[in-house]
């Protein structure tokens, strides 16, 4: 009962993904989740709820799975026209390989975990793979932050290695930055670093973050978020292209 969360949450993200799938003209979705993974299973469930269970084929894979060929085959054989896979980047890279090998023939949708240079690296050169993600930030949204982040990444070879070998600005990095400063604002408001005082001050924080304004509605522990960025993986340039913003209305 002591958490506060500044990112958008899965009920919102699942609905955004479903709305975007519909905007692409999708009518039947293949949904793949990792068994026992709360994020993966939960986001699929929220997508299915918004898209319509009668329009979805659902499967799960086990921990340690390395061959995803059967899942790609099942998506195609079931006549699906969108492939939803909110899974880890490790699993994603393998799914992308299979999608390219078998010529999946339908867009892949995923959540914020896929907003990573691991994904664009895995997809580079695979022009028969179309990937869209929902996420918190698009590089270029805040030039001052982007420049400072890239300077820091390039200042140390360890930083560069930890960022996947390049200075791409991942949305999770920006979210971590904003979370730090929301906590700092709460400490300032409390006038103390005492945990109880900071916890009491957090609900009143209103912070203009890199990812947008961050505030908590009365009694809420999740920040109010009403829009997500939709990005497309450019397999030629190995960067994320901004498609636009998507809400739940």
Where do the language-model regions lie?
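Extracellular/periplasmic bilobed ligand-binding domains
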Residues: 43-139
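Residue-level signal for short, function-critical loop segments
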Residues: 34-36, 137, 186
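Generic detection of short hydrophobic beta-strand segments and adjacent strand-loop junctions
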Residues: 59-61, 214, 246
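Segments of small-molecule ligand-sensing domains
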Residues: 157-174, 182-239
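Extracellular/periplasmic periplasmic-binding protein-like sensory domains
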Residues: 99-177, 232-236, 240-247
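An alpha-beta-alpha
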Residues: 2-63, 81-82, 171
